Design a protein with these regions (language model features):
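Active-site proximal beta-strand in glycosyltransferases
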Residues: 3, 89-91, 104-121
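Short N-terminal targeting/anchoring amphipathic segment
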Residues: 80-98, 112-113
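Short, well-ordered alpha-helix to beta-strand connector turns
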Residues: 35, 86-88, 108, 133
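N-terminal subdomain of nucleotide-sugar transferases
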Residues: 1-48
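A short, histidine- and acid-enriched strand-loop-helix "catalytic/donor-clamping" loop
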Residues: 10-12, 98, 111-128
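Short, charged/polar "capping" segments at the starts of alpha-helices
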Residues: 46-51, 121-123
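A short, charged, and often flexible helix/loop element on the N-terminal side
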Residues: 54-81, 92-94
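Membrane-proximal helix-turn-helix segments that form the acceptor-binding/catalytic region
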Residues: 26-29, 84, 123-134
Length: 134
């Protein structure tokens, strides 16, 4: 089962300098070690590129840095249909991201939303937003 982890959030995570505490990389390494080829799609406002991240005792992870439209802390990746077609599972996070909704609608048989809402007693606006998306 080939898996693509899609991060629809507009912040640059540079795996060429550091992979420590990047959740997507940790999850991808764990899946690869269990026999599931896994790659990652990250947003960038710099040069588009593909970076290989080594995994001890397994094949490397490919991290695709691609441009996307950014609006209200949402990334919309255009023109990635050929990339998405290469994978059995599209695992996205942040169920309130518009691109997560798009993937779930366009590829319902292979989209998995890994992250859901977390109630926060300190953040009333976040709790209201969760109610809207629920």
């Amino acid at each position: 089962m080939k898996i693509l982890i899609v991060r629809p959030w507009p912040s640059v995570l540079d795996v060429t300098k550091n992979t420590y505490n990047i959740q997507e990389v940790g999850l991808a390494k764990a899946l690869v070690k269990r026999g599931h080829p896994t790659d990652i799609l990250f947003w960038t406002d710099g040069d588009e590129m593909t970076v290989k991240v080594g995994v001890e005792g397994a094949k490397p992870i490919h991290v695709f840095y691609r441009h996307g439209k950014v609006l209200l802390k949402n990334v919309w990746f255009k023109g990635q249909e050929k990339l998405f077609a290469r994978y059995d599972v599209l695992q996205t996070a942040e169920y309130n991201q518009m691109f997560s909704w798009h993937l779930a609608g366009k590829y319902p048989e292979k989209t998995v939303v890994y992250h859901g809402p977390y109630y926060s007693p300190f953040n009333k606006n976040y709790n209201r937003m969760c109610r809207v998306f629920d």
